[in-house]
Amino acid sequence: IIIAALIMTLAGTVFLQLGSYFHASEHNTVFRNVTHPIVSKLLDIAVIITLFAIGFVMLAGAGSNMEQQFGWKTWIGSTLMLVLVLIVGMLDVDKVSKVIGAVTPTIIIAVIGVAIYTGLNMPDDIGAAMDASSQIDTPIGNWLISALNYNGLALMLAVSMSLVIGGDNISPREAGWGGVVGGVIYSIMMGLAGFSLLMNSDKAQGSDIPMLSLVDDVNPTLGAIMAVIIYMMIFNTAIGMFYALGKRLSAGHEKRFPVIFIVGCLAGFAVSFAGFKTLMNYIYPVIGYMGILMVAILVFAWFRSQSQIQDEAVRRERVRALMHLKLHPDKDYDAERYDDEIGQHIEDSNMDNEALYDELVEEVTEELDGDDDVDFDKEKYEENRHDHSYY
């Protein structure tokens, strides 16, 4: 868990900072800039395969979840999940993001709750619990390879959205710190889940969804609630995978998105009948190895580009500070002194000049407009703004 936590924190920092530096709107922007065109294409294909593979594994998992807790036929839970994904997938991206975001707190609460209960009800013989956990069969025997493979899998899932989230933050420095904080939080949650499973390995062994078995053993009613939460977790992942897959395959042909999205979901539904555990045992390790390679490539590119990234971070932060001074109604701005400096920094940036200027103006005007102590009206500013004043 410690090794996985360190890798996750480093990779989170790398993904978000590279996304910010290249102002990425999709993962290919970064892949194309840091690797050979052939490698970039292979990474893109690997991400596409991952999106589809995890999508159909989630549909299978939805069926197993409901079968384990309520005794439903697996196809019922999978079909219900398919319908939910198809309905929500037809919404616009902002609404999809809100649906996904609404589910996340319940997941965190559930994991913390199980960990607290486990801590208050530790097994009498911790050594026996550890021994029992070591007897559980895993797709990958070696503990170190297993930790690396798990990281590869998780990061392969996260890379596409992480690069885009990083690209939405104009400051590489802030994006990097966001990656550190996110990696630490993820590591804590992973540690809590691992602790719970380790101390209750006798109850979790043999079940498709171990965490559900733990909660159901405590109380069947809580088990039913947990089954619903896990179903929401599965939905969270499934909609993210199939939606991203549809967007990627319809890039440049956005009107085709609904058809591609529906076909992708139906194809995933068909494959899901191979069974959740079977799919996990074969699909997850393969994706994990692809993820290890991808992380190694991006981390190497990040280390190699550190000086440029840091220079760009300083450059953008300096322009932002000068723009704040320039637009603040209560501060004196020396145009003769600073206009040329702003223009030079923008020219030196790796970002498109107009895109960088517009992004920084948007950030600064949003901040000033939201400050009750500053007499600044963003709408009036935009009405009176006719050109980019740094030109």
What do the PLM-derived regions correspond to, one by one?
Residues 2-28, 196-200:
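Juxtamembrane transmembrane-helix boundary signature
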Residues 1, 22-50, 68-73, 211-226, ...:
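Transmembrane-helix boundary/entry motifs in multi-pass membrane transporters
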Residues 34-42, 104-119, 182-194, 260-266, ...:
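Small-residue-rich segments of transmembrane alpha-helices in multi-pass membrane proteins
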Residues 1, 47-51, 55, 117-122, ...:
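Hydrophobic, membrane-embedded alpha-helices of multi-pass small-molecule transporters
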Residues 21, 58-68, 82-103, 167-171, ...:
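Membrane-water interface regions at transmembrane-helix termini and the short interhelical loops
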Residues 6, 41-48, 68-92, 154-161, ...:
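Transmembrane alpha-helical segments of multi-pass small-molecule transport proteins
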Residues 107-133, 295-315:
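Hydrophobic alpha-helical segments and their helix-loop junctions in multi-pass secondary transporters
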Residues 314-391:
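Long, low-complexity, intrinsically disordered cytosolic termini of multi-pass membrane proteins
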